[in-house]
């Protein structure tokens, strides 16, 4: 990222306070962790705008960071927010207790689904809007094929991102709308005293099909347990049905496949 010029409104708050840099996760943002707040710096996008707006709409309905300041300078967004208490669900403490971890993932989903989204004015998370963003990403060479699941592209998969986009447009499933996080993976879920204490990285949050979050959660659990994200040995033989049993939901192979493939274009 180019040399940064922290906006005065934010600089006046953080001053010269000490901070660390958070390198957990797969986003291209720079995240600075202070004692009492977090500063996230990244290229401006639909998601950065949505994060500030959806946070105001959600308010105290969910444990999410409070936005202190949001500024955009030269195409770079700066979001200063309160810091969430607790530990990420991808921490060793939880990965070493798989059944407990899976219950907590389900607890977080249920918490999201309890929120009434009928009056939510932000619709960028709906499938029709997500496909528009996906098309923009494809047309502007913003899709990172190296991070895709091995079966998505290649001999038995799609030829390229354009072919995948065409398939997604032609195979849209009916939506069962709930409030979704949008990127419901373990690093974005915090726990304290065995309860969900917060959700972070909410730029994709909004009304969408519940399988948007279920699919990403299953993938995150699978790869955190099999060592792909940690770089270590396999910890646990995860079966998606373990999470679905906690949610009392049957496996929907069509929607699972669809939302995993959709995420490949982001």
Describe the function of each predicted region.
Residues 1-28:
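A short alpha-helical cap/connector motif
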């Amino acid at each position: 990222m180019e040399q940064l010029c922290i906006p005065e409104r934010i600089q006046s708050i953080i001053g010269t306070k000490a901070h660390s840099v958070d390198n957990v996760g797969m986003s291209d943002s720079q995240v600075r962790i202070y004692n009492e707040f977090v500063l996230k710096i990244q290229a401006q996008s639909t998601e950065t705008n949505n994060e500030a707006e959806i946070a105001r709409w959600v308010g105290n309905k969910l444990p999410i960071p409070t936005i202190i300041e949001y500024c955009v300078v030269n195409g770079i967004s700066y979001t200063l927010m309160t810091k969430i208490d607790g530990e990420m669900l991808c921490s060793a403490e939880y990965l070493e207790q798989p059944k407990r971890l899976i219950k907590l993932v389900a607890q977080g989903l249920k918490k999201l689904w309890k929120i009434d989204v009928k009056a939510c004015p932000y619709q960028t998370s709906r499938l029709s809007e997500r496909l528009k963003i996906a098309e923009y990403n494809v047309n502007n060479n913003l899709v990172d094929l190296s991070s895709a699941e091995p079966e998505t592209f290649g001999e038995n998969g799609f030829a390229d991102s354009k072919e995948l986009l065409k398939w997604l447009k032609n195979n849209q499933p009916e939506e069962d709308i709930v409030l979704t996080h949008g990127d419901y993976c373990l690093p974005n879920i915090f726990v304290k005293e065995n309860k969900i204490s917060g959700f972070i990285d909410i730029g994709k949050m909004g009304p969408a099909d519940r399988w948007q979050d279920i699919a990403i959660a299953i993938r995150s659990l699978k790869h955190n347990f099999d060592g792909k994200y940690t770089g270590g040995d396999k910890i646990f033989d995860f079966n998606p049905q373990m999470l679905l049993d906690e949610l009392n939901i049957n496996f929907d192979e069509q929607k699972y496949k669809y939302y995993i493939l959709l995420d490949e274009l982001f």
